[in-house]
Amino acid sequence: MRATTKACHPGLALMAAGLLSLAPSAARAEDMAGMPGMSDPHARCHQTMSHLEHATRTTADYALPEVGLVRDDGRAVTLAQALGGDRPVVLDFIFTTCTTICPVMSQTFTRLQAQLGDQADRVRLVSISIDPEQDTPARLAAYARRFHAGREWRLYTGAAQDSIAVQRAFAAYRGDKMDHTPVTFIRTSPGHRWVRIDGFASAEELARELHEQVAVH
């Protein structure tokens, strides 16, 4: 496995800062936690975002579990089908009630679609819920509309154990959705290694990664 470290894109940092300004600060969240009825369920996410300054790139091979998922249109598919085909795929993990990390990552996917332009139909974007018990297909569909998801960006839910199995397979399982961190995965085609980006990568960085990987392979 090889890794490089690069600074978080300024636009993403500003977006994250803006989201944080709309929510209680980490210190304030801790104060609220001790007050009846005033705990902030997203406090740990706020703390995570406040410490994210760099995105780290690594490459890895992941063994995909044989699990089923449910797409935002209600269609049952396997994980292999969701990630299959010979097109490049970009994957992340989100949940629809997240107010910190997920909106930033989903906005990045929105911008990535624009960055890809007429090549957008050749890249599959996949977002898998880490809160499948709450994220029904209808909720995912509404979330997709909120972020102007194109036809090649699909969101998936399913049984809790299947979501956890996928997260574990990608070494992204944190045990609690409130402890999740931003991580994005890119694969040019089946059989090739995944590029893993921990932290906030910009749409421009993801598009550049896709172009570089396709050129190499």
Predicted stretch roles:
Residues 68-72, 186-187:
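Hydrophobic beta-strand positions
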Residues 142-181:
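Short, internal strand/loop/helix patches
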Residues 122-135, 151-163:
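Thiol-based oxidoreductase modules, predominantly thioredoxin-like and allied folds used
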Residues 2-70, 213-217:
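N-terminal targeting signals for export/organelle localization
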Residues 87, 105-127, 145:
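Conserved helix-turn-beta segment immediately C-terminal to the redox Cys motif
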Residues 179-217:
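Thiol-/selenol-based redox modules, centered on thioredoxin-like
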Residues 79-103, 109:
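Short active-site neighborhood of thiol/selenol oxidoreductases, capturing the structured segment around
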Residues 59-64, 84-88, 120-125, 135, ...:
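Extracytoplasmic
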